[in-house]
Amino acid sequence: MKIDLHIHSRNGSDGHWGLEEIFAEGAGRRQIDLISITDHDSIRAQGLALELAQSYGIAYLTGVELNVTFSHPAYKGGNPVSLDCLGYQYDIDNPVLVEKLEALRNYRKRRVVRILENLNREFAKEGLPAFTVADLDAIEASVDGALGRPHIAKYMVNKGIVATQQEAFDRYLVQCDVPKMPLSLKEASELIRGAGGKLILAHPNDPNGTSLANLTPSLKEQLQIVHDAMMDYIDGIECWHSRHDHKTTGAYITFAQNMGLMVSGGSDCHQHPVLMGEVDVPDYVGEQFLKGLQSHVQGATR
């Protein structure tokens, strides 16, 4: 069984491909058997994803990636950092979840407006033309789901302001950032579990992402943080990830097994480059999800 439970789409967040392209590639050349679309703070693409999974004969888990704020008194002076969690197998029509994600979506638009205002101040210093309402509309039109800085970065490349999206972040978007709408780990857990799903700590040692590596590079200390401060709120850990090395994967698998947690894995593919199905996730990961929750699964194994 080939499994990828961490994929982003253009329909819902910052992926480069739409759902049709993802499923055509996944069912065709990649031969993926179990998949989940995990867009940032958005479940708008889930209905179509379920339909496409059934059409292509791929087993599917409803998914979402939630950005949460987390703090620990022993690190960063107790100041909060951003972490990511993955929600799986929730009811896409749960009214509380839908309402909260709509609030997050609306906040993201207001955040983008404020980021553009900050960018305009930097542009003025450099003699560059300011972003206008038309630019905001164009950025917003580029995505159906959750707006964010990657969409601004892509637009800046298209406008010729920077050569690459990474340059957009390095020169402008880091210093012009505006905080995301705070969502605590406890709130995220209540949202996903309240909708019948499971909450998984995403890529806990990702050196380039929103992970526990922002608190400490020590795997031993990370595991202690999970043990002491997260066990009440998570159902599992994403052990296999495209930016996890073998040591990280092994440490988190052992911890999860000892603590009775689920394990998950995926590429975190944004299709740039295309990594779908390239993380070797063992069959038992899929089996633990499929075993008791068939109501959320469409399609069949090959």
What are these regions (language model features)?
Residues 54-220, 224:
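Extended substrate/RNA-proximal surfaces in nucleic-acid metabolism proteins
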Residues 278-302:
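Mid-to-C-terminal alpha-helical segments outside catalytic/metal-binding sites
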Residues 1-82, 178, 183-184, 190-192, ...:
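An N-terminally biased module of ancient metal coordination in phosphate/nucleic-acid-related enzymes
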